[in-house]
Amino acid sequence: MQTEPYIQPMQSPDFKPILCIVGPTGAGKTHLAMSLAEHAQSIGLTVELISMDSALVYRGLNIGSAKPSKEEQATVIHHLIDILEPTEVYSAARFAKDAKQLCEDIRSRGNIPVVVGGTMLYWRAWAHGLSSLPPANTDIRARLDEEGKSLGWPAMHTKLAQIDPETAARLKPNDSQRVQRALEVFEITGKPMSALLAESPSEDGREGSVIPPWINLVSLEPSDRKRLHLNLEKRFDEMLVGGLLEEVKTLKANVALHADLPAIRSVGYRQVWEYLDGQTDWEEMRYKSLAATRQLGKRQLTWLRAMTGRNTFDPFNPNELKAALDFCKRNLV
């Protein structure tokens, strides 16, 4: 059986630790990264940003993903944006491999890599490596997909609970992608996914881990949750006014796309897709989108607050936001 190799983190004594800007959705990560890149340009340095966001990899997901504008991408070099069609799947393992290679390539050009984003599974894979889970088996996956369509994913979730109750307990019954993957792993290896993850060569990959010394983590953590939620509500309403509905209509016009694809399951896109399918009305779509966005932010903060060694700043405090930028400037080179 072939497995994806454990990805060793970069540890080079020739360079300072890599800056990584993280935070919950709506915390201002992109703004901080762009300010840092513009400062670097003003002193003759070049920062290249590596996106750590599972939605930004997809072409056509622009408005709902808060993708950096064409002007921003023209001003500062961005990587791992618009690299896939929404029919494709991008994994944490692939991100870890791509980010590692990009950091090496950027430094070989004499430039400075800065990783920015909030997809914490990508963070875990890049910072701590991955357990040796088997790669996808197309035959098994296709059969499980057919079973899921026939029996329904809640029934498949029940099946998973019988062989891997620990994994089933943390997955929603309709999370077809992850339920399918857990069943696939069991069929390939004969072991529950939870058992394989427990055998990971790096326990540091779990929540509560110490940040590796080759990363300088800047974490934007808003202290005012109510203000964050209001900002997220305002941003989503601006997305709706800015054409999110039309963007999802365009995606739906592609017959190769469906609601179970990872791209379409992205927060906001899934809810608008359901609305266009007639499953919800406008108010329910908006409510579900905002609830999903808040839940995403809560999960991101849970990940971050469990980490020791991070450099934390409140983006809603002007003095702390300035301190965050100053910290990044000091740690560029």
From Swiss-Prot:
Q: Segment Interaction with substrate tRNA: which positions?
A: 53-56, 177-181
- Residues at which ATP binds: G23, P24, T25, G26, A27, G28, K29, T30
Q: Return the InterPro entries for the record.
A: Dimethylallyltransferase, IPT, P-loop_NTPase
Do you know which Pfam families this protein is assigned to? IPPT (PF01715)
Which cofactors, if any, are listed as required?
Mg(2+)
Q: Indicate whether Nucleotide-binding appears among the record's keywords.
A: yes
Q: Which reaction(s) does its UniProt entry say it catalyses?
A: adenosine(37) in tRNA + dimethylallyl diphosphate = N(6)-dimethylallyladenosine(37) in tRNA + diphosphate
Q: Which SUPFAM superfamilies match?
A: P-loop containing nucleoside triphosphate hydrolases
Q: Where is this site: Interaction with substrate tRNA?
A: T119, R141
Q: Which residues cross the membrane?
A: none
The UniProt keywords, alphabetically, are: ATP-binding, Magnesium, Nucleotide-binding, Transferase, tRNA processing
In alphabetical order, the GO MF annotations are: ATP binding; tRNA dimethylallyltransferase activity
Subunit architecture: Monomer.
In the record, the note on similarity to other proteins reads: Belongs to the IPP transferase family.
* Role, per record: Catalyzes the transfer of a dimethylallyl group onto the adenine at position 37 in tRNAs that read codons beginning with uridine, leading to the formation of N6-(dimethylallyl)adenosine (i(6)A).
- Name of the featured protein: tRNA dimethylallyltransferase
